[in-house]
Amino acid sequence: MIRFDTLLFPGGLRRAFTLSYDDGVTQDRRLAALFRDCGLKCTFNLNSGLYGHRFSKKVARLEEDALDEIYAGQELGGHGLTHAALDHLSGAPLAWEIVEDKRRLETHSDRPLIMFAYPFGTWNDAAAEQLRMAGYEGARTVASTGDFRIPPDFLRWDPTCHHKDPKLMELARRFAEEKAEEPRLFYLWGHAYEFDLEDNWQIIEEFCRYMAEHAGDFWACTNGEFIRYVKAHRSLEYSVDGHMIFNSSALDVWTQTDAGPACVPAGGVLRR
């Protein structure tokens, strides 16, 4: 067996798809139901200091007692206690905005939060470092890449595109139908209230139906699931001759070898 170090996703797949929606608004109820119906996974990024806050007739935050029902089966992510621009904060106010939000949200999660979305998409190195110290492992920006690359730094994670991108369906077809030689990630983000404000729910409904039709071709995951899996793959340990691979993580990990796709079991060894 020759080590290739090529990341594969569960089942030996070469494609992964994840979603990220911000602000914890009332329209998330409809959106989360759509994702569940289509077998998709999303990280919903909330501001725990703004539960129930109404901004306009069509934009209102969910009450806290609705979270467990609406986001069942999905992932919660941090978005700052009050949606403050983190690059305008420092010291104790920056720490409080991040850490207190995380503490509150974790009362509605079955595991520690590791994913964050930068409010307004703005950040600096101090904010990223504060997130790391708080236990976050990933943070999404709003800078679209237009491609399917896997980020080298999850705390500065640029998504593929926003759902309003005019090339959304073109990107979906490229992702699902083009031959994938290297691992691919499609990362879509947005705000659910935009569908009501712009009366265009058909955009996300058409997109999700298309992705559901190709469900067997990609791994649908939350942001946090993706991070944990990729880090588990990166932590694989190899013998000098490449005939033995040890997986110290709690996740089964797939990788490409000269013999084809192979699963290295959690806590186990793959030998050839």
Predicted feature locations:
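Hydrophobic "anchor" residues on beta-strands that sit immediately upstream
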Residues: 18-19, 75, 218
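Catalytic-core region of carbohydrate-active enzymes that cleave or remodel glycosidic bonds
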Residues: 108-109, 131-143, 163-183, 205-211
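C-terminal domain-boundary segment and adjacent tail
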Residues: 2-9, 52, 106, 138-147, ...
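A short acidic, amphipathic alpha-helical/loop segment
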Residues: 6, 30-34, 126-130, 206-207
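Non-membrane alpha-helical structural segments and their capping/turn regions in soluble enzymes
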Residues: 91-96, 166-169, 198-201, 205
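Boundary/entry segment of secreted carbohydrate-active catalytic domains
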Residues: 1-27, 258
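Metal-dependent polysaccharide deacetylase catalytic core of the NodB/CE4 family, i.e.
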Residues: 36-137, 143-161, 184-192
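Active-site metal-binding loops of divalent metal-dependent hydrolases
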Residues: 21-24, 80, 192, 223
